[in-house]
């Protein structure tokens, strides 16, 4: 099936020297290179713009606009390109941002936000704003949140409404973003209306603070120490050993060849850790497994096949997952996978050329598709599951993305219940990053190389995988808006 690279490792651009000192001509050369690569790599860069002609027209118009500026900076170019790319609603395609220090002029309101099924709530605050804990955001500068989100959708990249709300959480309190949302905004405070825990609306005028030591004073909603927090850490959370919780905050393990090259240090082998956990559950005849995928930005989908095989045995390999995946062949994709057209054609048993699409199977029928460092663990099962608990829950939030979304989706197709907040990843979307570097700035960028379809295009979940169980605002309130509200809810479920 698909190979989804660890997205967090790719999101940070690496610049040689000072990006802001690059000449306008050099930046425009990078602009041209970016869009030439996008057209070669991306499976469909045109449809969102109304066709190839309109796409090229918009790219040309933006280039002319950038060329007409007196002094063009990389930040300005990236911001404009991101606005244009927002039409794709593709979280794997981006012109990356550089790794220079945060600008002093960046200022933020002293609040942090979180997405719940009903909207956006406050889950971090400076001490004097404690009264806003758990308050629901309703308006910004006199405009409804829905209206503000519609504006934000035109300047950031997101795949569905929940992903857009996730972007709002990290950007809506920033002065530079507010100026883009409200062109005439030039104030020392921003007005926001909140619905308080008691149901009353409160208008608050919030000041801005620059990057610096102030942010150490932010108070966050609490986490519950009963639950594991490290990657692939697991533990029973009840005295009777009936409920096991595993935390997976990155789909990355030692199963990935040369994992250290991605800046990741781990000795976890998925087949090994899942086998140990399931055997512990089997000894105690445990009835419930909770897999926590919140905050998981992705990684390598194929390392999780071993976990599903250990949970479900040969039934996993006989199940049509309904995930249709089509990959476009490009020079950059071949380079990423360290192969050639000749070798690829041989492995596929047919002649392939650049621009062709390869269809991947929706049934994982062979261990050949597994990325597993120790398949002997799986072979010893002889098709039988190690242990299948009566109830399996997988917990998601807006940050459950890419390979983490795939994991949640596959578990759901196998019968697990999805719990929490919908993923910001659309089921029907573009997928997989193919990285490339801009020649002058050295900036790391990416274009999707595949089309993914989990549902018919008119299916109500084509853009948003709706969880089977979603908490109400009152459910969150009952946990004092704990960061682990979904897990607390489940162990009481």
Features from the language model and the residues they span:
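Bacterial Sec-dependent N-terminal signal peptides
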Residues: 1-21, 34
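Flexible, low-complexity junctional segments that flank or bridge functional domains
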Residues: 20-290, 295-325, 329-342, 391-393, ...
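Short N-terminal or domain-adjacent regulatory/targeting segments
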Residues: 172, 363-381
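Active-site neighborhood of thiol-dependent amide/isopeptide-bond enzymes
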Residues: 294-296, 388-405, 427
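Low-complexity, serine/threonine/proline-enriched polar segments
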Residues: 323-371
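Extended, charge-rich low-complexity interaction segments
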Residues: 349-364, 448-470
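Short, conserved helix/loop micro-motifs enriched in His/Cys and acidic residues
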Residues: 371, 380-395
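C-terminal soluble interaction/assembly domains
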Residues: 402, 406-408, 412-414, 418-433, ...
């Amino acid at each position: 099936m698909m190979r989804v690279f660890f997205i967090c490792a790719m999101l940070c651009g690496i610049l040689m020297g000072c990006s802001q000192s690059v000449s306008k001509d050099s930046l425009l050369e990078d602009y041209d290179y970016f869009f030439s690569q996008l057209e070669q790599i991306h499976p469909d860069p045109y449809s969102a713009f109304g066709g190839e002609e309109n796409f090229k027209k918009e790219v040309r118009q933006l280039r002319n606009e950038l060329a007409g500026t007196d002094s063009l900076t990389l930040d300005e170019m990236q911001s404009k390109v991101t606005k244009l790319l927002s039409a794709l609603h593709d979280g794997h395609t981006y012109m990356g941002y550089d790794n220079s220090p945060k600008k002093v002029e960046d200022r933020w309101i002293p609040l942090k936000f979180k997405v719940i099924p009903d909207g956006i709530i406050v889950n971090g605050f400076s001490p004097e704003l404690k009264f806003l804990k758990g308050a629901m955001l309703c308006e910004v500068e006199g405009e409804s949140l829905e209206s503000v989100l519609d504006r934000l959708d035109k300047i950031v990249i997101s795949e569905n409404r929940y992903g857009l709300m996730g972007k709002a959480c990290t950007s809506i309190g920033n002065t530079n973003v507010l100026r883009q949302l409200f062109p005439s905004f030039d104030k020392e405070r921003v007005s926001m209306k909140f619905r308080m825990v008691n149901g009353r609306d409160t208008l608050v005028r919030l000041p801005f603070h620059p990057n610096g030591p102030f942010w150490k004073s932010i108070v966050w909603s609490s986490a519950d120490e009963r639950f594991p927090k490290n990657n692939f850490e697991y533990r029973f959370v009840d005295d009777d050993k009936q409920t096991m919780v595993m935390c997976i905050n990155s789909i990355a393990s030692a199963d990935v060849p040369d994992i250290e090259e991605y800046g990741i240090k781990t000795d976890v082998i998925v087949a090994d850790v899942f086998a140990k956990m399931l055997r512990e559950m089997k000894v105690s005849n445990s009835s419930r497994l909770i897999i926590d995928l919140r905050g998981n930005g992705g990684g390598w989908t194929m390392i999780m096949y071993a976990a599903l095989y250990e949970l479900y045995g040969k039934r996993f390999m006989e199940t049509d997952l309904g995930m249709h995946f089509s990959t476009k062949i490009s020079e950059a994709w071949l380079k990423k996978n360290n192969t050639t057209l000749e070798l690829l054609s041989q492995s596929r048993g047919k002649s392939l050329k650049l621009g062709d699409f390869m269809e991947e199977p929706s049934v994982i029928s062979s261990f050949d598709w597994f990325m597993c460092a120790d398949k002997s663990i799986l072979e010893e099962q002889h098709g039988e599951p190690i242990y299948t608990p009566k109830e399996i829950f997988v917990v998601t939030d807006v940050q459950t993305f890419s390979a983490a979304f795939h994991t949640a989706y596959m578990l759901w197709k196998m019968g697990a219940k999805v719990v929490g907040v919908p993923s910001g990843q659309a089921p029907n979307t573009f997928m997989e990053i193919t990285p490339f570097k801009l020649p002058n700035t050295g900036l790391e960028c990416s274009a999707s190389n595949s089309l993914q379809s989990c549902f018919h295009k008119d299916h109500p979940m084509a853009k948003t995988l709706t969880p089977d169980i979603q908490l109400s605002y009152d459910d969150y309130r009952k946990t004092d808006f704990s960061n682990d509200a979904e897990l607390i809810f489940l162990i009481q479920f």
